[in-house]
Amino acid sequence: MADSSSTSAFISTLIIYGLTAVVFVWLFLLLRPKNRRVYEPRSLKDIQTIPEEERTEPVPEGYFGWVEYLLSKPHSFLIQHTSVDGYFLLRYIGIVGSLSFVGCLLLLPILLPVNATNGNNLQGFELLSFSNVTNKNRFYAHVFLSWIFFGLFTYVIYKELYYYVVFRHAMQTTPLYDGLLSSRTVIVTELHKSIAQEGEMQMRFPKASNVAFAYDLSDLQELCKERAKNAAKYEAALNKVLNKCVKMTRNKTQKQLDKLYNNGTKPKDDLETYVPHKKRPKHRLGKLPLCLGGKKVNTLSYSSKRIGELNEEIHEKQADWASNDRQPACFIQFETQLEAQRCYQSVEAILGKKNFGKRLIGYSPEDVNWGSMRLSSKERHSRRAVANTIMVLLIIFWAFPVAVVGIISNVNFLTDKVPFLRFINNMPTFLMGVITGLLPTIALVVLMSLVPPFIVMLGKLSGCVTRQETDLYSQAWYYAFAVIQIFLVVTATSSASSTVDSIIDRPRSAMTLLANNLPKASNFYIMYFILKGLTGPTWTILQAVNLLLSKVLGRVLDSTPRQKWNRYNTLATPRMGIVYPGIEILVCIYICYSIIAPILLFFSTVMLTLLYVAYLYNLNYVFGFSFDLKGRNYPRALFQIFVGIYLSEVCLLGLFIMAKTWGPLVLEVFWIVVTALAHIYMKRKFIPLFDAVPLSAIRHARGEPGYSYPTSDLGLQEIKDIADEMKGKYEQDNTHGILTPVTKDDLKKANLIPDNDGSSENGTPSNPFESGSERASLSGSNAESDSIKKLNDTVIKKSSTLSSSTKDNNESTFVPEGEKFRKFHYSDVEALRNKRPYDEDDHSKHGPEGAVPVNADAGVIYSDPAAVMKEPQAFPPDVLETNTWTRRILQFFNPRRSYPFDSVRMRFPLVFNTSIEYDEEYLSSAYTDPCVREKDPIVWCCKDPLGVSKQQIQEARSNGLDVRDDFTRYDEKGKVIFTYNPPDYEPEAKK
């Protein structure tokens, strides 16, 4: 058998990857000060898409001053500046990295001598692995240390799941999340036909303020897509010809200009002067590409007229959208989170399991996959089955190239039986190390990088209701894919290739030989961890792709004001469902080999430490916030750690069987049973609490006397009792119904009043859900009776613990006494105050005293000035000063004392003080397909000094198309410049 190449591969890999990492870090330090938009965009004041609370301070001076600066910040700082999802990602890396370090301290001093001495005298890293042991009694050290190490992992998983549940419950009771529209809306899908009516749902949930159903709006959706496509083409074509006009006149002599204008007979502001009609941009109609498409048309004239026609068609369908077929999904809105949680926790008991598919809470209208709303249970299950089948087939076929990678990692063992590979034996040691260490690790990274986009696409096609569900679907399948390919396939092929000679000679002992050589596969993962630990983090902070897009491709590809604005103001956002599995598989590998080849723990510790630092920088300074998953990837990642524990235990079991060591075998079987029982217990205890918030927790946070957080079981029993209580009330209700004022929309459906066109002058459809002040009487008279008027004067108002008009005994435990909003006293905040988005004399908006108001797409956002100004009190410390190290160590083994509800809540940043007052018009139609509320497009072109843009604006306006050149100009080089936001830009309020 050939000798192991682990030492030469290790040295070659370490040198090459080490030098690569040094180059990446050097480039990062060199380029960062001169390219702040690439390396610290979150600190720039002129990026409009970053709310002030999320903006970070500039990177501290010094090459690595930011490391100490960020590591010294409390968790509250990270929650505010990296988002809840970013915070839990960092926490996950920190937790598993710390456990890897503990494993080094616990396992290496014992297992390395046990493995290395008086064994099989193997070479290289194999000397330090399980396969070098010959004395069967030594295996007791492995089994008992596996108990300790895996037991520690299991307890930490339990402790972190406990923390996550308390964190979620505390977060949901903060002023921000308590008042969100998504926190007050329950989504129920796949409803049975017998209850898919507003009246049926109102009858079962009488405290609902609004019940909205999804509708089949496929025709309207197609029209909106066509309009958006034409608007994009028109905007690109218009800016293209304007750029050409400016280019034709820039740096021209008077003689050349006279020739261009034909001595004054051609107007300067006419596009025909510069670009004749026949030479203007054209495109083909239809969906087929290039010459296979339909008729070729002038883009400017055709799109302008077509958009005007589409505007009229869309307005008609938007005004009459409720007449379409209803879909089996409804959105039940409540005035408070308390009632929404009561509904969410009792939906299954009241409706029955067979009468609906899924119940969801905490998802905004933007989160909903509206195309999935029409699916019935059978259709959704069929889609999921098809998507899962495709994933299984992908895993099977992807195993072949990955298997080649595993074989290459131990290719030197195949030279005796594969003649054409014998030339490898004549290679220098360093080159052999490159082939067996460098080449397979790079190939594996490339192969795995091709998979995520496909998995995300399958998630969307599988019938996921929300984009969060799609993300969690991607996380589950990408992790499964990685475990099978990176661990199982590579381990099997690598160990098989190293034993092929012996298997051919002794086929009956193939299983024993494979088991004994399984630890040799750890050599590949040492190289893989070096790659991930050295080049991974340094490549991440180098931001080479963003640098290329910003400095090279952006300047070539972006020619319109909107393209340039998007390039500058749009930040990259991490997709957590893809980021997590990439780290989880590394954790799985080091757990699996922690007992078999413990030396791997040293490399995993270094790798995870560097990954933590890299993500700490990027999440604070580079990445923007993605859609809000509320940290849901974190508990899934914790549960998926059990995969690594099970695999490690099964591998040890197989090794003990092959070694015929029955004592360690029985002990390992016992621990597998303990692990499985702990896993089942945690799933039953914690998963039902991820989205359900105990009502007592909400009331306790509001300061209602007699309520406290249910620490004993985190509210699990209370949630079950609420379901039984609500079911009992519904069954005892004799009337099974409620009386509500009739709306004009109801009267139109009943043909009692004419269905007039409700479109407004600006093309925005009338409100499909009438607000309280627009209720109509059944009598047909314009005057309403006093009793009806009293009912109709009710308006949904946002109640906030930050308001100066809070009720007695309603003091939030979130904001301590004396820490209410203060008066403005900083110049920056004074500037915000002067730009108050609403009239000082208009009392229709009642924000908290001293709050910083900002107009947004769905209402007004009121922020805490301390959070906006990054004042020290905005970031509470992690641990009270009275907590000594001894006390903290003791509390580690008692999650109830480590994470009491009130303490966790008080540690949140003051950004959770934010309050949002939604517009009534938005609230009434929030949970409808976005195409119902979609506004007419605004084309944004660059203002040229010739006046051509103004002429084109007038021409487009005659066709019903809104074109504007606000906040744009050409610089002295003839390049497009934007000076402010697009005319259709609005800051987004959290929903």
UniProtKB/Swiss-Prot annotation:
One of its GO terms (molecular function) is calcium-activated cation channel activity. It is found in: Cell membrane. The chain crosses the membrane at residues 10-30, 92-112, 139-159, 389-409, 438-458, 472-492, 524-544, 583-603, 605-625, 638-658, 662-682. Keywords: Calcium, Cell membrane, Glycoprotein, Ion channel, Ion transport, Membrane, Transmembrane, Transmembrane helix, Transport. Residues 1-9, 113-138, 410-437, 493-523, 604, 659-661 are extracellular. Induction: Regulated by phosphate levels. Residues 757-785 have a biased composition (Polar residues). Disulfide bonds: none annotated. The keyword Transmembrane applies. Acts as an osmosensitive calcium-permeable cation channel. Belongs to the CSC1 (TC 1.A.17) family. This is Phosphate metabolism protein 7. The lineage of its organism: Eukaryota, Fungi, Dikarya, Ascomycota, Saccharomycotina. The gene is PHM7.
